[in-house]
């Protein structure tokens, strides 16, 4: 059998792949590690320059400590100098050994770079600006773990829209503020504060007029208290998970549509006046305020949220369409006192006109739980779906069977105000669970 022909050249059965067009070869290389993709340059002349057009580079020191006779950082510099693609969509650097040459690596990037992720497991310094071209073209920048951020000189990330800072350290208090002020069109800021030995700041000033999404997580609460001063008038999405932090919001956030707040009760009260415009809210520590725009409410139930609180929230959310209750009891039902639920004087407006979806995960079947279920199902005229789920441990499955059957029958017997409501009952088994 004769070998097939492509154009004027014979193609051997052992090397058909080499005659594929560049875009397909680049697609193939995207599925293997970058160091392996670079090694294909040794296969033949056809492969020698293909990797240089790869739109993404993933350089991981853990899987490639040395590149030939070169150290990892030296090899990276060589690769970045050799890269010829007009646009480098993504560059991912993972450093395992101490390096003070990250900025030198960045200075070797020739093409337009849109996204960069730098993860360092030993303290490594990034100094800006060393490569002004990179600073001007970046759209997404993610710095993770033991990266020391040093912004000592004026710099402008004129295209940067997303900035993630995860457990990084700052060379001085001004580095964080200077970095934010250098991002005139920033829309997304994800700030993860590490424990005390990771970063030196205990106060953060976030003044970003263009910011639309802000996420703050502070895991240092056991070691210190962190203070945040925030001015983000264009914010739409807010997530805060800080147990012992202090927040000062300088101005209102009229565009806010979704918030997830996990903070101490005092700080949550301070935040409430900024949350009255939200459409989606996840918050365990609410007080009585009117949320006219709230369409979605998710509550993680614990001892601070009893039945009275849930019904009060329904009263203060007149346009609510979706209610999600998530409960994972930490102690036995028999150890918990029965609490009678006080019904509001009038049926909440959301039950009469708007509530369409109810999800209750971890329904425990306590008397007050049943009272809440009876009240909501018996008054929600527009309810389409009510999904109620129970959790129990695999080790006590048989022990709970009879009790569970009783609870299921109780739920099925509840009279529903909405004739179109579909009641869905689910059971989930957890490995270890005290109930």
Curated annotation (Swiss-Prot):
One Pfam family hit: LRR_2
Protein name: Putative FBD-associated F-box protein At5g56820
Signal sequence range: none
InterPro entries recorded: F-box-like_dom_sf (IPR036047), F-box_AtFBL13-like (IPR053781), F-box_dom (IPR001810), FBD (IPR006566), FBL13/AtMIF1-like (IPR050232), LRR_dom_sf (IPR032675), LRR_PRU1-like (IPR013101)
Domain FBD: 341-390
F-box domain sequence ranges: 14-60
Domain of life: Eukaryota
């Amino acid at each position: 059998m004769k070998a097939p022909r492509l154009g004027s050249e014979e193609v051997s059965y052992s090397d058909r792949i080499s005659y594929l067009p560049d875009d397909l070869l680049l697609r193939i290389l995207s599925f293997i590690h970058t160091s392996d993709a670079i090694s294909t340059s040794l296969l033949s002349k056809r492969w020698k320059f293909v990797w240089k057009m790869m739109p993404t580079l993933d350089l991981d020191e853990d899987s490639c400590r040395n590149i030939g006779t070169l150290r990892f950082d030296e090899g990276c510099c060589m690769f970045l100098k050799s890269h010829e693609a007009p646009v480098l969509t993504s560059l991912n650097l993972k450093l395992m050994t101490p390096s003070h040459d990250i900025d030198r690596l960045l200075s070797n990037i020739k093409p337009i770079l849109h996204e960069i992720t730098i993860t360092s497991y030993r303290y490594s310094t990034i100094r800006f600006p060393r490569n002004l071209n990179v600073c001007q073209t970046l759209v997404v920048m993610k710095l993770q773990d033991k990266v020391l951020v040093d912004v000592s000189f004026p710099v402008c990330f004129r295209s940067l829209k997303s900035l993630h800072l995860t457990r990084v350290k700052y060379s001085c208090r001004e580095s964080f503020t200077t970095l934010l002020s250098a991002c005139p069109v920033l829309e997304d800021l994800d700030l993860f504060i590490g424990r005390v030995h990771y970063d030196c700041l205990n106060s953060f000033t976030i003044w970003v007029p263009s910011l639309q999404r802000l996420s703050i997580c502070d895991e240092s609460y056991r070691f210190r208290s962190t203070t945040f001063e925030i001015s983000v008038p264009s914010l739409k999405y807010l997530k805060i998970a800080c147990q012992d932090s202090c927040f000062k919001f300088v101005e209102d956030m009229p565009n806010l549509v979704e918030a997830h707040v996990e903070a101490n009760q005092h700080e949550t009260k301070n935040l409430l006046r900024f949350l009255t415009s939200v459409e989606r809210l996840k918050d365990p520590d609410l007080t009585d305020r009117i949320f006219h725009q709230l369409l979605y409410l998710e509550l993680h139930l614990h001892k601070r949220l009893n039945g009275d609180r849930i019904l009060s929230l329904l009263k203060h959310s007149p346009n609510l369409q979706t209610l999600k209750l998530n409960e994972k009891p930490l102690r036995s039902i028999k150890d918990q006192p029965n609490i009678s639920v006080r019904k509001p004087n009038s049926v909440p407006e959301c039950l009469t006109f708007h509530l369409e979806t109810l999800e209750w995960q971890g329904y425990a079947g306590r008397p007050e739980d049943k009272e809440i279920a009876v009240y909501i199902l018996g008054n929600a005229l527009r309810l389409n779906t009510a999904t109620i789920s129970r959790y129990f441990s695999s080790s006590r499955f048989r022990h709970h069977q009879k009790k569970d059957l009783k609870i299921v029958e109780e739920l099925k017997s509840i009279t529903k105000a909405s004739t179109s409501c579909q009641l869905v009952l689910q059971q989930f088994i957890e490995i270890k669970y005290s109930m």
